[in-house]
Design a protein with these regions (language model features):
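Short beta-strand-centered aromatic/proline hotspots
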Residues: 38, 76-83
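Short, conserved beta-turn/loop elements at beta-strand boundaries and strand-helix junctions
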Residues: 24, 45, 83-89
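A generic structural motif
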Residues: 42-44, 82-84, 100-102
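Short, charged beta-turn/beta-strand-edge "cap" motif at the junction between a beta-strand
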Residues: 67-71
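N-terminal helix initiation/capping motif
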Residues: 1-43, 115-126
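Hydrophobic core residues within well-ordered beta-strands of beta-rich domains
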Residues: 15, 36, 62, 74-76, ...
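Short strand-loop-strand
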Residues: 24-58, 63, 95
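C-terminal output/interaction extensions
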Residues: 15, 88-126
Length: 126
């Protein structure tokens, strides 16, 4: 009998050919912002997992754009929950949990949430 307990409430889904662009804002004026991009591994309306060459520190707040195959972009803000270097290819998996959705510009927009929900309907089980 397995002791593994699935804690995920939302089903993850994959969006073919999507990439994640991210930017970690500089905390001090003499720092440069950290930017990069990676392949989207899977997605929910609450977060994203993607693969990069660069390690991003857990706890970091990122501005993200999910770029779809048709060049549509979904802007999001989230916090890095964890990162892990993969033994297979040396790439790094990063998981980001999105902050709340609200009309306040300091939060993710409801427009972005609607786009995520549409992607979920289209690619669930993909």
């Amino acid at each position: 009998m397995s002791s593994f307990v699935e804690r995920r409430i939302l089903e993850r889904f994959h969006v073919p050919n999507a990439i994640v662009k991210y930017k970690l804002e500089a905390l001090f004026s003499d720092q440069l912002p950290v930017e990069g991009k990676g392949e989207l591994i899977d997605l929910t309306v609450k977060g994203v997992r993607f693969e990069t060459d660069e390690e991003i520190k857990a706890g970091s707040r990122l501005n993200i754009e999910i770029v779809l195959d048709d060049d549509e972009k979904i802007p999001l803000i989230g916090n890095v929950v964890w990162t892990k270097r993969l033994d297979i290819n040396g790439k790094i998996n990063s998981v980001v949990e999105f902050i709340d959705f609200d009309n306040d510009p300091e939060f993710n927009s409801y427009d972005s949430l609607e786009k995520l929900e549409a992607l979920e309907k289209e690619y669930r089980g993909y």
